[in-house]
Amino acid sequence: MHNVGIIGLGYVGLPTAIGFHDAGFEIWGVDVSQRTVDMVRAGENPTGDPDVDDIVPAPGTERWNITTSTAEAVPHCDVVLVTVPTPITHDLKPDLSYVEAAGRAVFEAIPK
């Protein structure tokens, strides 16, 4: 079995994590929002997408690990996908600060 890390459990990351979990992978999902983590751990959908409401794994589901800590998750993962927001700035350029922060956190958590 392979372990997949998903950094960012929003409208892209959460369904991606669920899809990999349903395919048999162990999931290490990470989000900076404690509220999001608490909801996903409770089997609830924090995204607002009604298509996800009935597919979030229930509490205690095997191979489903959800945390706010990238440092906790990454050492368990064979691959890490970053699915964080890239909002548009006032001058219509992508704000990559979330991607950069997630990338740094993943890099720092990789076992040396």
Residue ranges of predicted features:
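Structural/interface elements that position substrates and couple domains in central-metabolism enzymes
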Residues: M1-K112
